[in-house]
Amino acid sequence: MKKFLYLTIAALALVACGDDDHEENNPPQEKQYTKLVTRANMDISQELLNIADITVYYMNEAGEVVNERMTSPVLEKTVTQPIPCKTGMAVTFTVKPDLNPTAEEKFDIKYSGKLTTTPYTKNNDPGAMLNKVFGLDLKGVRGDKLAETLSHHTTKIAYTYTADGKQADTSIQWGF
């Protein structure tokens, strides 16, 4: 009986003394990201849409800057790009050419938006999501200050992504 007990203890000791170095020899692999999904959303007040030409700039699937005019109060865009890449969004506001506001007129400028970026591996495993929220809510902007106010509230968001999923602020030549 003692012999059986000693053999059991010896067997357990051998198992317990196994190679614990396997983690040092095989460090965990960093995830490699292959694509970036960018979602842009904007909500514009009807009053702002009536008084301003609003142009949205963004990076397309090929990494080129494209733009479009907002003609409705809601914008939703989803773009998928290969990583490494640059992504982002810019929004410009200019007073409509046929609008000649006076100092006595008052305008409310209201918009909100969100840019969400998520990197994915080739197996579609998502990495860290980044949300950038922006917007403006100004009440009673005088008509004679409208153009100046709108020009000071251009939105520019730009990021670069690398294959290891790291994101950094960058600059993009938007073309305006």
Describe the function of each predicted region.
Residues 4-40:
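Bacterial Sec-dependent N-terminal signal peptides
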